[in-house]
Design a protein with these regions (language model features):
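Residues immediately flanking
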Residues: 13, 63, 97
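Conserved long alpha-helical elements within nucleotide-processing catalytic cores of c-di-GMP signaling
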Residues: 1-7, 14-44, 50-54, 58-59, ...
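Short beta-strand-to-loop capping motifs
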Residues: 59-64, 101-103
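Gram-positive cell-envelope targeting signals
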Residues: 10, 138-139
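Conserved Rossmann-like nucleotide-binding pocket used by diverse enzymes
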Residues: 9, 60, 98
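PAS and PAS-like sensory/regulatory domains
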Residues: 91-96
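Catalytic-core segments of nucleotide cyclases and related cyclic-nucleotide turnover enzymes
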Residues: 21, 70-77, 81, 87-88, ...
Length: 139
């Protein structure tokens, strides 16, 4: 879709608390730095990466084209796979990702909520894949 000039990506580090609990907060700090580096390397110059809260990041991209946003997501996932295969770290990073396009009539709050909601859809899918017995009859 075109016609707007901003897209957003919200990224949450999956199981970040476990990294802190198992390896300590210093290693958790390293994981946050590594995560930011993985994202930054995958983004175009038109993107701005920000730490939003705790283990969440937001990326704003000067495009309203959903294909360009999805390209960024694919690049981030590819960069993440490469990091996990080559870093030698004792932890593996995993991201849950949600996107949105800032559309006419949206507020900044609704833009953030849409990214967050889409990110939690992915996070919940990952949880059900790891713990299938938790899934309800209705799905």
């Amino acid at each position: 879709r075109k016609g707007t000039d901003m897209g957003g990506i919200m990224i949450d580090l999956d199981d970040f608390k476990s990294i802190n609990d198992v390896y300590g907060h210093s290693t958790g700090d390293d994981a946050l730095i590594d995560a930011a580096r993985v994202m930054r390397l995958a983004l175009p110059d038109t993107a701005m990466l920000m730490r939003f809260a705790g283990d969440e990041f937001i990326i704003l991209i000067k495009t309203g084209d959903s294909e360009e946003i999805e390209d960024c997501v694919r690049n981030i996932r590819s960069s993440l796979r490469e990091f996990n295969e080559t870093s030698g770290r004792k932890y593996k990073l995993s991201f849950s990702i949600g996107t949105s396009i800032f559309r006419s009539g949206m507020t900044s709050d609704s833009f953030l909520k849409e990214m967050d909601s889409n990110m939690y859809i992915e996070k919940n899918q990952k949880h059900y894949e790891r713990h299938p017995s938790v899934r309800t009859v209705n799905g």
